[in-house]
C-alpha cells in the first residue's frame, strides 16, 4: 500500500474532495452566469472571516447546527435516521420559553432549569420515536416527520395562547433576564458598559455588537462527549453493534430495543438543548409564529453527512456550513450573484460526501492493480531467468 492510497482511505480525504468539488461546480455555475468566481469567493471568505464581528456571527450560527449535526450523526451510527431533529429542536425552544417565562429564579438556578427542560422536551420527542420503532417496528422517518409538524403547530399554539402571547406581535413573551446566557449582558445594557466592552482588544467589538453566548462551548463539549461515549464506553459499543447488525447484536445478548430508545432520547436531547440555548442566548429570547421550519434540524443532516457522521467531525463541519450561510450574504451584496449559489455549493458537497465510499474503493482498485502488475513483473523475471538457465545448459552441452 503506497502513501497515496493510505491517504485516499482516510475519511477526511473524502470530505476535502467533496468540498473542492462543491466549489468547482459553483465556479462553473458562476462563470456560466457571467459572474467572476474569484470575486465571488473573495466576497464569501471576507463575509465569513473579514471582521471579528463576522467570525462571531458564524460561531453563533454554527452552535445549533453543531448540536443537531451531532444528534443526527449519533443516531446514524446506531442505525437510525433522525430526520426529526427539526421537531426536537422546536420542542426544546417551546418548553424552554414556557419555563423561562413562568419562572424567575436566580440565574444560577434559572439557566440550568431552562436548559434542562428544553433538553428533556427534545429527549421525550426522540424517545417516543425510538419507542415506536422498538415496540411496533414503525420506521423512525415516518414518526419523526409527523412529530416535526406537531412541534410546529404546538409552537404556534403556545405563541398565540393568552398566557404567553406578546400583545400586538407574532411573538411570545420573552423569557426572564435571569435565564439569559449571553456574555456580558449587564454591560451591554448601558452605554458605559458597551464602551468598556469595545475597548477589549480583538474580541471586544464582536462581543458588544453580537449575541455572543456560551452556547458554542457547551456544543463543543457535547460533541466531544458523544464521540467519547460512542467509542470509549460499553454503552457506545453496544449501540454501535446495534447499528452494524441488530440481529447479531440481539444474538450476543445486547438489548436492541432499549438501545434504540436510548439512542433516540440522547439524539433528541441534543436537539432540545440546542433550541433552549438559542432562546437563552439570542435576542429576542422568545419564540415566534412559524409559517415554515427554521431548518436548524434539517441543516444538521447536512452537517452530519459533511462530517462523515463523526461527532467530533461535526465541529469543523458546522463552522464551514455556518460560514457558507453567513458569508453567502456578501456574495449577493458585493457581486450581485444570487444567494442560491451557496445552496449549490452545500448541495454538491453533501452529494459527493454521499459518494464518499468511491475514493476508498478507488484506492483499493489501485492497490489491486499495483499488486497484479508486481506479480506479472515477478513472473516475467522468473520466466527470463528460466530461459537463461536453459540457454546456458545447451551451450554447456
Language-model features, listed with the residues they occupy:
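Cytosolic-side transmembrane-helix boundaries in multi-pass membrane proteins
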Residues: 1-21, 27-31, 244, 251, ...
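Membrane-interfacial amphipathic/re-entrant helices at transmembrane-helix boundaries
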Residues: 1-69, 108-109
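Short loop segments and helix-boundary regions at transmembrane helix junctions
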Residues: 2-13, 76-84, 106-108, 112, ...
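Hydrophobic core segments of alpha-helical transmembrane domains in multi-pass membrane transport
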Residues: 15-31, 68-72, 93, 97-99, ...
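Single transmembrane alpha-helix segments in multi-pass membrane proteins
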Residues: 29-33, 49-103, 115, 119-141, ...
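Transmembrane helix-bundle core of multi-pass membrane transporters
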Residues: 148-230, 341
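Helix-loop-helix "hairpin" substructures at the membrane interface of multi-pass membrane proteins
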Residues: 188-195, 208-285, 311-312, 316
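Transmembrane alpha-helical segments in multi-pass inner-membrane proteins
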Residues: 265-347
Amino acid at each position: 500500500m503506497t502513501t497515496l492510497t493510505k491517504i485516499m482511505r482516510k475519511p477526511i480525504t473524502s470530505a476535502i474532495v467533496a468540498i473542492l468539488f462543491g466549489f468547482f461546480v459553483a465556479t462553473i455555475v458562476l462563470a456560466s452566469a457571467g459572474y467572476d468566481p474569484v470575486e465571488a469567493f473573495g466576497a464569501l471568505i471576507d463575509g465569513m472571516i473579514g471582521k471579528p464581528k463576522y467570525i462571531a456571527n458564524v460561531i453563533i450560527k454554527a452552535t445549533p447546527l453543531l448540536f443537531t449535526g451531532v444528534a443526527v450523526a449519533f443516531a446514524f451510527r446506531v442505525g437510525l435516521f433522525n430526520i426529526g431533529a427539526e421537531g426536537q429542536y422546536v420542542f426544546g425552544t417551546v418548553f424552554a420559553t414556557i419555563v423561562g417565562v413562568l419562572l424567575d429564579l436566580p440565574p444560577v438556578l434559572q439557566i440550568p432549569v431552562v436548559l434542562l427542560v428544553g433538553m428533556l422536551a427534545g429527549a421525550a420527542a426522540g424517545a417516543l420515536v425510538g419507542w415506536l420503532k422498538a415496540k411496533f417496528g414503525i420506521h423512525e422517518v415516518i414518526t419523526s416527520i409527523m412529530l416535526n409538524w406537531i412541534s410546529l403547530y404546538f409552537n404556534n399554539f403556545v405563541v398565540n395562547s393568552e398566557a404567553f402571547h406578546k400583545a400586538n406581535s407574532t411573538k411570545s413573551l420573552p423569557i426572564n433576564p435571569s435565564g439569559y446566557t449571553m456574555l456580558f449582558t449587564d454591560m451591554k445594557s448601558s452605554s458605559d458598559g458597551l464602551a468598556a466592552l469595545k475597548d477589549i482588544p480583538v474580541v471586544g467589538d464582536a462581543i458588544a455588537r453580537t449575541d455572543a453566548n456560551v452556547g458554542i462551548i457547551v456544543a463543543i463539549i457535547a460533541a466531544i462527549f458523544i464521540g467519547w461515549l460512542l467509542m470509549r464506553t460499553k454503552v457506545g459499543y453496544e449501540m454501535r453493534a446495534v447499528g452494524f447488525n441488530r440481529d447479531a447484536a440481539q444474538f450476543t445478548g445486547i438489548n436492541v430495543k432499549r438501545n434504540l430508545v436510548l439512542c433516540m432520547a440522547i439524539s433528541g436531547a441534543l436537539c432540545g438543548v440546542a433550541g433552549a440555548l438559542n432562546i437563552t442566548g439570542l435576542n429576542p429570547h422568545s419564540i415566534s409564529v412559524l409559517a415554515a421550519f427554521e431548518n436548524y434540524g434539517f441543516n444538521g443532516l447536512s452537517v452530519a453527512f459533511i462530517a462523515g457522521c463523526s461527532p467530533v467531525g461535526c465541529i469543523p463541519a458546522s463552522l464551514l456550513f455556518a460560514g457558507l450561510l453567513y458569508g453567502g450574504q456578501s456574495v449577493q451584496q458585493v457581486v450581485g450573484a444570487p444567494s442560491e449559489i451557496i445552496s449549490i455549493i452545500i448541495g454538491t458537497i453533501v452529494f459527493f460526501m454521499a459518494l464518499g465510499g468511491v475514493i476508498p474503493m478507488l484506492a483499493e482498485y489501485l492497490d489491486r492493480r499495483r499488486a497484479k502488475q508486481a506479480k506479472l513483473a515477478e513472473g516475467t523475471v522468473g520466466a527470463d531467468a528460466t530461459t537463461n538457465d536453459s540457454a546456458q545448459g545447451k551451450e554447456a552441452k
